Amino acid sequence: MKFENEAVQIVSDFLDASMAPDPVKAATYMSEDVRITFTGGRVMPTAKDITAFNAGRYRWVKKQLGQFDWTRHEDHTVVYSNGTLYGEWPDGSSFSGNRYLDRFEVRQGKITRMDVWNDSAEWILTPSIAKP
């Protein structure tokens, strides 16, 4: 998908690579000192760590991208991506409709910060709240 806003394009391209999953390509969109924080406050130093974390939590997972929202600041752009996750849990059962919200900071053409929130933890703890 093509976007007029450069920061949104960078985030979109990163998400495409990370969902492939291609952590090597995904890392090319991130600064060397990127700060990645996942649900539960889990800090991850690299895109490879995201792939490893997801491999432990899901058999496989993809994003159904929703809209992108962004706001420019003096030295960076904040980009929000929202939508839903779908895939399979480690036991092979499928899921969809798992809400996510990712927040990115993009500076000088690179993602410098990524914050991730989704419903996975709640769905794992209480599977009955997951809606097909």
Q: At which residue positions do the language-model features occur?
A:
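Short, low-complexity N-terminal intrinsically disordered segments enriched in polar/charged residues
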Residues: M1-T28, E32, A130-P132
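A solvent-exposed, acidic/Ser-Thr-rich amphipathic alpha-helical stretch
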Residues: E4, P23-T77
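Hydrophobic alpha-helical core bundles mediating ligand binding, dimerization, or RNAP-core interactions
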Residues: V11, L15-S18, M30, I50, ...
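Hydrophobic pocket/interface hotspot
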Residues: F14, K25-A27, V34, T46, ...
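Mid-chain, well-packed structural core segment of small domains
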Residues: D69-D91
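Exposed beta-sheet edge and beta->alpha loop/turn motif
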Residues: T84-Q108
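Low-complexity, intrinsically disordered terminal/linker segments enriched in charged
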Residues: R113-P132
